[in-house]
A protein has these predicted regions:
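Inward-facing hydrophobic residues that define packing positions of alpha-helical scaffold repeats
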Residues: 13, 20, 124-125
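Solenoid-repeat scaffolds in large eukaryotic assemblies
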Residues: 9-12, 65-66, 121
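Inter-helical turn/loop segments and adjacent helix faces that build the functional surface
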Residues: 1-13, 115
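TerminUS-proximal long segments
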Residues: 116, 122-127, 148, 152-156
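Extended glycan-interaction surfaces of carbohydrate-active proteins
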Residues: 17-100, 132-176
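Short, hydrophobic/aromatic alpha-helical segments in well-folded domains
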Residues: 1-4, 22, 107-111
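Alpha-helical support elements that line or immediately flank enzyme active sites
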Residues: 51-61, 105-118, 125-128
Length: 176
């Protein structure tokens, strides 16, 4: 935006460069995934989460994550779970231990589309839309059976629905 407005973006460009270099330090060879890293302990969380798939949304087009994505999506029906279903820590109802969040799914889907992974992006979109259409604007959903959980009227879930519904209507009318 700054460049469009003909503003000085040197400082922000420097921040972006540092972040782009730093993101690769979040790759955890042990689990073959991007992972959370605890700066205090100096250790990885050793867990694949929905945040692991935010690499594409962040402009890091890493094909190594595709096999993890495919493996996990083959185990669920209602969007990207917030935690790996194969993990002993997985709990499909517990906050950030398994439920699917529409807002995270939207960002992952956008990232996949930006990376040219259109079929995978559509899978995330269709599964998320299925959860919302069947169960309303819940805060999050069980990724296996779609049961709504948390708050029942979340605006970010409604915003995801409206954003993706707009795209669906545009596609049906031959418009983007």
């Amino acid at each position: 935006i700054g460049m469009v407005l003909d503003q000085d973006v040197n400082e922000i460009s420097g921040w972006i460069s540092i972040q782009e270099q730093g993101v690769h330090r979040l790759w955890n060879d042990k689990i073959s995934s991007y992972d959370s890293f605890d700066l205090n302990s100096g250790k990885f969380a050793d867990s694949i989460s929905s945040a692991s798939f935010m690499c594409w949304y962040g402009g890091v087009y890493d094909t190594r994550m595709l096999s993890q994505f495919d493996r996990i999506m083959n185990k669920v029906n209602y969007g990207v779970p917030s935690h790996d279903p194969d993990s002993v820590k997985f709990d499909r109802k517990r906050y950030w231990r398994g439920p699917s969040w529409a807002i995270m799914n939207m960002m992952i889907g956008i990232g996949l589309a930006d990376a040219g992974e259109f079929e995978r992006a559509e899978l995330v979109k269709s599964q998320t839309n299925l959860a919302i259409s069947q169960n309303g604007f819940a805060e999050y959903f069980d990724p296996i059976d779609g049961t709504p959980a948390g708050g029942t009227t979340f605006t970010w879930t409604a915003a995801v629905w409206l954003g993706w519904a707009k795209n669906l209507v545009g596609e049906q009318n031959g418009r983007d």
